[in-house]
Amino acid sequence: VSKTRMIPEGSDAISPAPHHDIYSIEDLRQLVYSIKEATDYKKPVIVKVAAVHNIAAIASGIARSGADIIAIDGYRGGTGAAPTKIRDNVGIPIELALAAVDSRLRDEGIRNSVSLIAGGSIRSSSDVVKAIALGADACYIGTAALVAMGCHLCRSCQSGRCNWGIATQRPDLTKRLDPDEAYGRLVNLLRAWQREIKELMGGMGINSIEALTGNRLMLRGVGLTEKELDILGIYHAGE
């Protein structure tokens, strides 16, 4: 990392959020097609963005740039190296962002031109089902996978002293992680989620993920404001 980033060992690695080569849809489009040409149009181009207040407009621009997939990361997503105040207070919940993006792309008639992948606070199979029903084509996980592998959520990934040997290069710590055991735990997690998702879908009378995608009639809100329900496109529980 020190060599690649040209940062002296022991120094803070400051990674600013802005991409100073992207200030418009045209700039993004140029980058997207540069990547497509470099990969001979054989690899999908994914643009990942944080869930923020104007995410619907941002996603619309990404879809028009020619990207194949939009990955949306809800607040509380990210690495264990992120400052706690930033992780817990910056951004908006993935549910609101996802619903807003799906509705915007459908209204503009470009929903089928791009896939939506959701992440950030996806902690269980029920979170996956809710995300799919709100418009996601798929979900991705980070922290949930790490926990399955043995992560204790110490939130000190940047220190190089991960006591489970996951986020470190120190030989005395990496030897604590058994890759085969970690692999088995992760496989168990995903297989359990798969079974639970099937059970939840069966309870809703749905027999395929495709039939669940964007099917908000399957969802109801509890303890949500009228504005939140409007953005999510769902009814109060009991309605």
Regions found by a protein language model. Name each.
Residues 10, 55, 61, 91-92, ...:
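Glycine-centered secondary-structure boundary/capping sites
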Residues 1-14:
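ATP-dependent carboxylate/acyl-activation modules
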Residues 7, 33-34, 183-184:
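Short, flexible segments with low predicted structural confidence
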Residues 1, 122, 196-199:
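Hydrophobic alpha-helical context, especially transmembrane and signal-peptide helices
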Residues 9, 143, 190-193:
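Hydrophobic alpha-helical segments, principally membrane-spanning helices and signal/leader peptides
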